[in-house]
């Protein structure tokens, strides 16, 4: 009920919210070896999301349709559909893109038709915590997408979300996505912020090792184009 949700926003003193899928961010990993199935699944998901919530209900509830770049033609077509229905924000997972030809960097130039349209439209792309396909290499039970049992205690699998976000954003900078599309706006949601210190250190180190590779300072490029939602317990000093 959209209006009931607006009432809750009013009770909490919130002007507007972004609305993300809880389980929808898990399924691309399960289907990644079948790009056609990925497209069919998320086209259906996005139609349901728009029907139930809308993409900009009263300019207060901004539901985020989910996008995969597994088929860039599909992604561009789906983006046009979402933009035509008022989408302000879209959701992707922080992971390599699994295409019919194998995995690719999300900043590969083969995906430029999608990124170009995103930049032109001015919508925000959210890299939301998801099943990004990371493994604990035997230190803990994997299979995030297929198991919803509670954790008995801490293990290294807890760092997978941060590892995925770190690698995703490093790749966007390394592959010069923001240099090609200076109007892009990307947000990191539910990935925390503790990975930032190490990311900035590595970006500076890489710039020194590969002198002349970057047109812009990589750390400043990140700061200009990426907004990060920290966990409440993160030390952001």
Predicted regions and their residues:
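Helix-coil boundary/capping segments in enzymes
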Residues: 1-237
